[in-house]
């Protein structure tokens, strides 16, 4: 395992993700950034490197686009599956908007005039923004906790959705309060509609519904506490050297800071390194622009490990190319002579 450093300044941190590999206590690692900056490639590559130094690693995609299957050329689903060619690296792709019916084990609605009451209660109880996503995320955490992986990496959705999970305990508490309020308000009416076993016409038991919600809320609250422990959790920001991406990265880092979530690594993808004497005007102009934003990144985040990754000629897909790309997260890329 290399710890090579190309920067010799004493005050400059190593431009690699080696610190993440060395921090054995880390259990949760999030990889996030603006859409199209290489989050999935980075998260897959980091997972490959971690698998070399950890007992077991799980890579989870919470991005609706689900690019893990494309990256590894292997189909993944909502159950953890071993990645071909690895003995201790698994992956899964989850739907962040799983249906309430599926999450609550909802039975099919019956027939008759009262058949719609269960559905109405459900619609009223779950008419809370984000409840589907919150419950889906809580179910995943519940499953992940029982699987006892040493390290879990999240390939997150684009920036706007990345930190939504931090609000999920509040969302689930609102849903619990709503169900409780409805059961009180409609108590007399429900008494005439409840089945012999105390269930609604569609088979859903209110007590079981509240118990399920409470269990999910406890799970997500417990794990959120771990997310705020820098010994257990870190967030890797991925960007490209352009204005909008830099702006999104700064906004994300500020938000992470407000939630007390550790972040000390930034991966800058798609860097151009024109050869000395290159007559490609577009390449040189773009490199000049990239250099400006790269200098801003290094100035703004002088206390971060800033990893510089080159724009490659070939698409990074498949185990072999991902492994090759992952090496540059640990051993800094050295541009050809004359490349700046």
Swiss-Prot record:
Quote the Pfam families the UniProt record gives.
ArsA_ATPase
Per UniProt, Zn(2+) binds at 280, 283
Matching entries from Gene3D superfamilies are given as:
P-loop containing nucleotide triphosphate hydrolases
Task: Report a single Gene Ontology molecular function.
Answer: metal ion binding
Asked if the Swiss-Prot or TrEMBL record annotates the protein with the keyword Lipid metabolism, the reply is: no
| Keywords tagged on the record | ATP-binding, Cytoplasm, Endoplasmic reticulum, Hydrolase, Metal-binding, Nucleotide-binding, Transport, Zinc
Residues at which ATP binds:
34-41, 242, 269
Q: According to its UniProt record, where is this protein located? A: Cytoplasm; Endoplasmic reticulum
Q: Which HAMAP family match?
A: Asna1_Get3
Q: This protein is called what?
A: ATPase get3
Q: Which organism is it from?
A: Sclerotinia sclerotiorum (strain ATCC 18683 / 1980 / Ss-1)
């Amino acid at each position: 395992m290399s710890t090579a450093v190309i920067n010799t300044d004493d005050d400059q941190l190593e431009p690699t993700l080696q610190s993440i590999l060395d921090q054995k206590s880390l259990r949760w690692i999030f990889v996030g950034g603006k859409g199209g900056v290489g989050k999935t490639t980075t998260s897959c590559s980091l997972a490959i490197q971690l698998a070399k130094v950890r007992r077991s690693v799980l890579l989870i995609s919470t991005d609706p686009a689900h690019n893990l299957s494309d990256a590894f050329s292997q189909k993944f689903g909502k159950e953890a599956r071993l990645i071909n060619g690895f003995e201790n690296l698994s992956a899964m792709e989850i739907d962040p908007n799983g249906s309430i019916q599926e999450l609550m084990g909802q039975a099919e609605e019956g027939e008759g005039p009262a058949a719609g009451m269960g559905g109405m209660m459900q619609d009223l109880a779950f008419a809370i923004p984000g409840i589907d996503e919150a419950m889906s995320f809580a179910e995943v955490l519940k499953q992940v906790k029982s699987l006892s992986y040493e390290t879990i990496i999240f390939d997150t959705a684009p920036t706007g959705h990345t930190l939504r999970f931090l609000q999920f305990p509040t969302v689930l508490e609102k849903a619990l309060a709503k169900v409780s309020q409805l059961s009180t308000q409609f108590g007399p009416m429900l008494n005439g509609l409840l089945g012999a076993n105390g269930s609604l016409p569609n088979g859903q038991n209110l007590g079981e519904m509240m118990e399920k919600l409470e269990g999910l809320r406890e799970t997500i609250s417990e794990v959120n506490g771990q997310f705020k422990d820098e010994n257990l959790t870190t967030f890797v920001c991925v960007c490209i050297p352009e204005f909008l991406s830099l702006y999104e990265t700064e906004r994300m880092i500020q938000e992470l800071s407000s939630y007390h979530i550790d972040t000390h690594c930034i991966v800058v993808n798609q860097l151009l390194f024109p050869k000395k004497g290159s007559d490609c005007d577009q390449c040189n102009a773009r490199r000049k622009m990239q250099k400006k934003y790269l200098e801003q990144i290094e100035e703004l985040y002088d206390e971060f490990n800033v990893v510089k990754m080159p724009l490659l000629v070939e698409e990074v897909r498949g185990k072999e190319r991902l492994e090759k790309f992952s090496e540059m997260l640990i051993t800094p890329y050295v541009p050809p002579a004359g490349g700046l």
